[in-house]
Amino acid sequence: MKMFKSLSLLPRIVSPFQKCYSTDLISLVGIPRVKITKGQNRYLLVNIHTHGFTKYGRVIVRGADVDNHLTVFDSILEELEPQGICAKILGGGRILNEADSKKIKIYGTSRTFGSADHTRTRNILHSWTTYKDFKITVKN
């Protein structure tokens, strides 16, 4: 009988951990995988994760028409830090987004963060519904 009483305490012990992990994962899923503007962008390929849980990350693409990749990185931090999400830059480059003709060209490298895996970036863009029908070319 004592064993059943101790087992009845199990949900009380597990519940706080379950809530903690599930809310962290929900906050990751709520972040859009792609944010780029029309025209020429400097972009970063970023692995995001909740603090302490690097194993359960997600790769996102962020780009903007700015002077350098550090400005893109600063905007990423402004977006993610209030939610307690950490970012690790995997590399960068440029994206030419011709939305009218449904073409995207991924090329170049970031002097600050090194070159991103452009093929991986292309796959992420293709998985996003906005860019599913676009012709995406990669130039290394």
UniProtKB/Swiss-Prot annotation:
Binding site residues for substrate: 42, 110-112
Protein family membership: Belongs to the janus family.
CC per GO annotation: cytosol
GO biological process annotation, one example: sex differentiation
Function in brief: JanA and janB regulate somatic sex differentiation.
Assigned keywords, A-Z: Differentiation, Sexual differentiation
InterPro entries: Janus, Janus_sf
UniProt keyword Cytoplasm, yes or no: no
Name listed for the protein in its UniProt record: Sex-regulated protein janus-B
GO molecular function: protein histidine phosphatase activity
Active site residues of this protein: 69 (proton acceptor)
